Amino acid sequence: MGTNIHIDMVIHGKHTAEIRKMFNRVAQAYDRTNLVLSFLQDAHWRRAACKMLGVTAGEEVLDVGAGTGASTRTVARTGAAVTGIDISPRMLQIARNRCKRFQNITWRLTNGDLPFPDKSFDAILMVFCLRNVSNIQGFLCDAARVLKPGGRLVVCEFSHPRRFVAPFYRLYLRYVLPRLAKLISSDPAAYEYLTESIEDWYEVDELAFMLEQCGFQNTSWKRLSFGAVALHRALRGPE
């Protein structure tokens, strides 16, 4: 599939450098803020994503957008060799400090790319990070490149609830979440960006189609929390 490509993050007027600064600013209170804003569901979503990935001991796993290492730790407990990457040095420093007891985690600071050889990993996990990439399909195709044939990809992202939940969800995103963020976050503006990026995100079938366009197969998805979050699972096709 060729060499790795650099995917610059440009979403809602923000470039990679701006997004890096934003995550550096929110890093210290990131986990606590997410727990409150998700009504204690954040940890549940992450566990569900890791369970769907189905990792076993000895596998090579890439955690994209590892952040403070919340999902990375869960994967590492399986005995897999985990590489956690992120664009924020502050996030990764917190992750390193919290995961010192894990000898099977390697941390790497990146610039929004996947700087790895072809067919490097058995599985890839992306939890709440794909929205921050401008060229979503290009990034997913690069993920296919670094996966081994038959390798698994799981994407956990915010989604769009349907039917009676949708209007209440929009009300929360536009009015409640920003006000809560002002009370508990070190950077409320970052959560305005969060709202915008969620509202502009793809429908579940649209993301599934992009995965298939990149050569992924057996694509499926699962909705969580009345559709506020969706998990996508796909396999890289054979050679």
UniProtKB/Swiss-Prot annotation:
Query: For this protein, what is the EC number?
Result: 2.1.1.163
Q: Which reaction equations make up its catalytic activity?
A: a 2-demethylmenaquinol + S-adenosyl-L-methionine = a menaquinol + S-adenosyl-L-homocysteine + H(+)
The keyword Electron transport belongs to this UniProt entry's keyword annotation:
no
* Pathway it works in: Quinol/quinone metabolism; menaquinone biosynthesis; menaquinol from 1,4-dihydroxy-2-naphthoate: step 2/2
CDD domains from the UniProt entry: AdoMet_MTases (cd02440)
Q: Which residues form a coiled coil?
A: none
Q: Where does the record locate the signal sequence feature?
A: none
> According to the UniProt record, what class of enzyme is this?
transferase
- GO MF term set: demethylmenaquinone methyltransferase activity
Q: Which Gene3D superfamilies match?
A: Vaccinia Virus protein VP39
Cited Pfam families: Ubie_methyltran
Q: Which UniProt keywords apply?
A: Menaquinone biosynthesis, Methyltransferase, S-adenosyl-L-methionine, Transferase
One GO biological-process annotation of the entry reads: menaquinone biosynthetic process
Q: Which residues bind S-adenosyl-L-methionine per the record?
A: T68, D86, N111, G112
What does this protein's UniProt record list under function? Methyltransferase required for the conversion of demethylmenaquinol (DMKH2) to menaquinol (MKH2).
Concerning its family, UniProt says: Belongs to the class I-like SAM-binding methyltransferase superfamily. MenG/UbiE family.
Q: What is this protein called?
A: Demethylmenaquinone methyltransferase
